[in-house]
């Protein structure tokens, strides 16, 4: 069965790349910063949940509360399911609404086992994932301000995390290694054509400056060209 979360996940991942590139091109407004964090968090969460689904790991979700016999049967069917992608794909919207999915902080706790051999020995992405969670919580649930949300250092960390996470997407293997539909990326090697929007084989940033990004932006260069032509 085709992974059920990936269409949504790829939309979010492609959006995160666009907003990341926009910020690097000097569009450092709060709107772009919020959308970058939101899209990246959404993509990472969905992809990690998809990994759990592809490995038929039932920790991915739970029935909220068993209220009647139908709910009890749904719970039993869930734990008996051997193809979680197919199980969730065939549920009605009403039954889907009865599930709570795993929380992001729990995904952080599981990430080393979940990513498996895609991580180097002793490697951890806990710091980066916790930063992403903190920024997402702040922009969703509490006060943020232009100039203080997503610092230059934080943007640098998340940019470089995206490079590492994309490598994980490239190399991650499901338990059933022979089922190629269960791999995360729908292509091998460098993406081409329509898939090119998902690639993130970039060079890591050693530092980042919003001011420098604005000065070096396409718009600033265009204005400079117009002024110099007079």
Name each model feature, range by range.
Residues 60-130, 134-135, 145-146:
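Flexible secondary-structure boundary motifs
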Residues 127, 131, 144-230:
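Polyanionic, low-complexity intrinsically disordered segments
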Residues 28, 55-65, 180-184:
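Short, glycine/acidic-rich hinge or "gate" loops at secondary-structure transitions
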Residues 18-24, 110-118, 140-142:
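Short, charged/polar, low-complexity loop and linker segments
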Residues 1-42, 47-55, 189, 205-213, ...:
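Charged alpha-helical initiation segments
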Residues 18-21, 48-53, 137-145, 167-178:
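Charged/polar positions within long, soluble alpha-helices
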Residues 4, 31, 35, 124-127, ...:
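A structural signal for alpha-helical segments
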Residues 8, 15, 39-42, 128-138, ...:
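Charged, amphipathic alpha-helical oligomerization/scaffolding segments
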């Amino acid at each position: 069965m085709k992974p059920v979360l990936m269409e949504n996940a790829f939309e979010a991942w492609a959006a995160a790349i666009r907003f990341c590139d926009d910020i690097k091109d000097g569009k450092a407004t709060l709107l772009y910063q919020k959308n970058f964090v939101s899209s990246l968090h959404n993509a990472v969460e969905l992809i990690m949940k998809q990994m759990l689904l592809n490995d038929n790991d039932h920790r991915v979700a739970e029935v909220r509360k068993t209220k009647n016999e139908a709910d009890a049967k749904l719970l039993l069917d869930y734990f008996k399911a051997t193809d979680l992608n197919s199980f969730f794909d065939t549920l009605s919207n009403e039954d889907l609404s009865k599930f709570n999915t795993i929380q992001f902080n729990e995904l952080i706790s599981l990430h080393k086992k979940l990513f498996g051999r895609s991580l180097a020995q002793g490697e951890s992405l806990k710091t980066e994932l916790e930063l992403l969670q903190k920024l997402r919580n702040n922009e969703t649930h509490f006060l943020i301000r232009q100039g203080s949300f997503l610092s230059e250092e934080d943007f640098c960390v998340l940019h470089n995390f995206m490079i590492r996470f994309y490598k994980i997407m490239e190399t991650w293997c499901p338990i059933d290694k022979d089922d190629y539909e269960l791999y995360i990326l729908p292509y091998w090697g460098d993406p081409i054509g329509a898939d090119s929007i998902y690639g993130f084989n970039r060079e890591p940033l050693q530092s980042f400056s919003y001011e420098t990004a604005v000065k070096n932006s396409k718009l600033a260069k265009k204005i400079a060209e117009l002024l110099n032509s007079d």
